[in-house]
Amino acid sequence: MKNAVICLLLFGICLTVSAQEKVETVSMRYETQNDMPLFYQKLKESLTYPMAWGNSSIRNFEKWREEARKVLLDCMQPAPPVAAFDKEVIDIERREGYTVEKILFNVSEYSRVPAYLLVPEGKGPFPAVLLLHDHGAHFSIGKEKMVRPFGVEASVTADADDWAERCYDKQYVGDYLASHGYVVLAVDALFWGERGRKEGVRYDSQQALAANMLQMGMSWGALIVWDDIRSAEFLATLPMVSKDRIGTMGFSMGAHRAWMVSAATDVVKAGAAVCWMNTTDSLMTLTNNQNKGGSAYSMIIPGIRNWMDYPHVASIACPKPMLFINGLRDKLFPVKGVESAFSTMQDVWKGQSVENLLTTKFYDLPHFC
């Protein structure tokens, strides 16, 4: 009897251990890694980009360009309702060779936005640049990254000076352009500067903002592009601006904005994009910064990857003059992906016999190039 009891106890212990092993085995199952689904490679392989030039059945380039832009704008819907710009000058400062106006204008019915408008001395009309600020995970300033601020608290000026030193070789790009004869418009994107959080800067809130907007049918990334389109259209209404010479430029997220708005509207005649071009295949990996969410939402257009990749969208800008620069030591944008994207765009411009209007350059520099 004693032996039977011992056997039963041992059998029970074995069952318990076996059950624990099964629980542990089950608990080790997973289907995401580094916030990517394990099937992410299959997702990438499924992307055939049917609207890309060369993949599309449309063989007339102008017709393709029209239809590809329509697809892009459809993916960006809904567009914010349009309102009269109703420009208002609220402050002005004269600088050497140009003036800086702090203005307000309606970028949509939803938003009346502050901006800096820089106007060269002399008789216009002048060429103009829509100058688009970066992301930088630095939200306390936006337009002030591009234009030396005035009429602000000392802390804002110090913040802007520090950013110009860190990212722009101590140069306010907007002031440089204005001193060389360009009208410049710099506007905060939603979530930056004077369009930021009432509660104060918080990195994680950009993901919450994006999710909340998606739940109400709108994309944060698309809204930024719509605002940039309207900002370009606003520039074109100004009497001192030569409407046939409106360009755009930006660094990092500003570069993404630059080629996006160049693709989205022909109000923009030329663009320069510094340090933001790649392919989905190279960016969507287990180790790239793009898979962290958060900041990526500011540049996501829902559904567009089912139609076109980044260089395909940028190619809608063809035959405009475009400049793309990337760094060989840029850890955010793998060189292999940049090379592939550059090659895709070069084929498009060359195919339209305007290869001289596309410049793609690498510099042996990191992201801040």
Where are these regions (language model features)?
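Mobile cap/lid helix-loop segments that gate and shape the active-site cleft of serine hydrolases
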Residues: 212-215, 223, 230, 270-314, ...
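Cap/lid segment of the alpha/beta-hydrolase catalytic domain
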Residues: 124, 132-226, 236-237, 283-285
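Alpha/beta-hydrolase fold nucleophile elbow
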Residues: 240-250
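C-terminal catalytic histidine-bearing segment of alpha/beta-hydrolase fold enzymes
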Residues: 343-369
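Short beta-strand/loop motif that positions the catalytic acidic residue
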Residues: 317, 324-326
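Gly/Ala-rich beta-loop-alpha elbow adjacent to hydrolase catalytic centers
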Residues: 250-254, 258
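N-terminal targeting or regulatory segments adjacent to alpha/beta-hydrolase or S9 domains
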Residues: 19-99, 107, 142
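Proline/glycine-enriched tight loop/beta-turn segments at coil->beta junctions
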Residues: 110-113, 120-128, 135-138
